Amino acid sequence: MLSVPHLDRDFDYLVPAEHSDDAQPGVRVRVRFHGRLVDGFVLERRSDSDHHGKLGWLDRVVSPEPVLTTEIRRLVDAVAARYAGTRQDVLRLAVPARHARVEREITTAPGRPVVAPVDPSGWAAYGRGRQFLAALADSRAARAVWQALPGELWADRFAEAAAQTVRAGRTVLAIVPDQRDLDTLWQAATALVDEHSVVALSAGLGPEARYRRWLAALRGSARLVIGTRSAVFAPLSELGLVMVWADADDSLAEPRAPYPHAREVAMLRAHQARCAALIGGYARTAEAHALVRSGWAHDVVAPRPEVRARSPRVVALDDSGYDDARDPAARTARLPSYRWRRGSALQSGAPVLVQVPRRGYIPSLACGRCRAIARCRSCTGPLSLQGAGSPGAVCRWCGRVDPTLRCVRCGSDVVRAVVVGARRTAEELGRAFPGTAVITSAGDTLVPQLDAGPALVVATPGAEPRAPGGYGAALLLDSWALLGRQDLRAAEDALWRWMTAAALVRPRGAGGVVTVVAESSIPTVQSLIRWDPVGHAEAELAARTEVGLPPSVHIAALDGPAGTVTALLEAARLPDPDRLQADLLGPVDLPPGVRRPAGIPADAPVIRMLLRVCREQGLELAASLRRGIGVLSARQTRQTRSLVRVQIDPLHIG
């Protein structure tokens, strides 16, 4: 495969007689292209060619293992077309690097896996839950968006759906955001399905282990693959079910070109394989809800009485909730301690969860006078303080130290904390609650499970440990840091983070209380209080549809120097009212937190241009951009190549 976009096409080669038996569709080969040897895959064998010139000869077969199956090739083509990418970029995500020793290992012949009986009672609490399991048992292509109840052991429900599908003779693919979720689902799945038939794929595996497990899926010995985002391309045949947990987690968005989202790839795969699909989570994204609204998927949601019985009591604590007479400093205090200290959670021996948006000490700084965010002078990354005795602010992107902070907007040298991190919060709690154990779970220091007993747990979103019997209470801090972001998904992301934490708290009948430090009138806070993720997703989808934002439309973001972006638009002939009804929006600045495209000098200004089309014209927009990228690629040399970064429906639009 060739890395330059204008050569992203098939090439014909002659096959020498000595390689004819091994050079079958799907195998890796080496061919000579413009005088150099390059890697490739055999796509098909034909007796003739449409090429009228002289054909070159295949140099050698790297391995007779057919790693690029017909199903995965179709998926690669579809993803490249959907995201305006090259097949080479998608193949880099889909097919891992070869490990010769692993290929030579003898694989046991796949047999029928041992599957324990599935108890459907866990799904009975949900409308259409039993019907969904029954459809999987009959190998029907049932598609559902599942709203997990608070306190639900989601991995058990996923494992039951997987076991039901494997028992029916089909394979299953389950995608989760991170290693911790993978471990949780692995433990639940192997309790029902023979461990030798279950494979886990994640980025943390070494090349040898990853390729061994990937081959187990290819050769048919694995019937259930659990993995993080890139595992969505696992080469399973007879696919019966594709599952995605917590599709709101941005870990499922691939940071490498062409930047596909695992949820979208999974749904593409379910459509191509005509198999069942399941998206689950405590909260719901507008994209998942759009699948329900379109009729492509069904709702699997518990009735309201069951939701109320299983959810904790949620209290919003705004400024009017502070008692100035009792605590004059409470109105400006970050930890409204007396309000939740008065609860009985710690006294009863239950742990209390404190969720903060960011890890570290003070991960974000701003000017004390004009409130402009403090950014690195080198790469424009956010500046942070690493500890109480830090010699200066440190860039979270490039690591440069700025010992003399001065605002680039107003010149002030006074700074303030925008967000207080988990480490600083733990310090504050330690002083406020002497004698109580304070546990921090954030960043590289993750605590998967708590021991029984009272404790204060400070955790960042997604790092919350599970507690035996659930937490007695939870405090959700710095809500403005989530809701106040200038981002399309700010409200959706905040609700997902809050509900993921609140789902770990005991039901209201057992005394569970969640306190969110936010104005109770905010619609997102109201959705948390009512525990209504479906209603929030419905409102979010309606609002985006009204103003023309994804998922009601497709948007392409073009990032790069102004001249190169303009050249791409001209090469792609966009916008073109006669061919494609596209709205051109911008130029705008890159959204906060979005890195600059690679290869562009640090001092070169970067803009973002947006192209918006209706849902029906998404593939046509991507095709136009692919053609334009190919034209630019053909014009440029290796020394001058500076292509625009193209993202279709990026998470952060600006």
From Swiss-Prot:
Free-text comment on the cofactor: Binds 2 zinc ions per subunit.
Obligatory cofactor(s): Zn(2+)
Binding-site positions, Zn(2+) 2: 376, 379, 395, 398
UniProt keyword annotations, A-Z: ATP-binding, DNA replication, DNA-binding, Metal-binding, Nucleotide-binding, Primosome, Zinc
InterPro entries: P-loop_NTPase (IPR027417), PriA (IPR005259), PriA_3primeBD (IPR041222), PriA_3primeBD_sf (IPR042115), PriA_helicase (IPR050880)
Gene Ontology BP, a term: DNA recombination
Function text: Initiates the restart of stalled replication forks, which reloads the replicative helicase on sites other than the origin of replication. Recognizes and binds to abandoned replication forks and remodels them to uncover a helicase loading site. Promotes assembly of the primosome at these replication forks.
Protein name: Probable replication restart protein PriA
Lineage: Bacteria, Bacillati, Actinomycetota, Actinomycetes, Mycobacteriales
Gene: priA
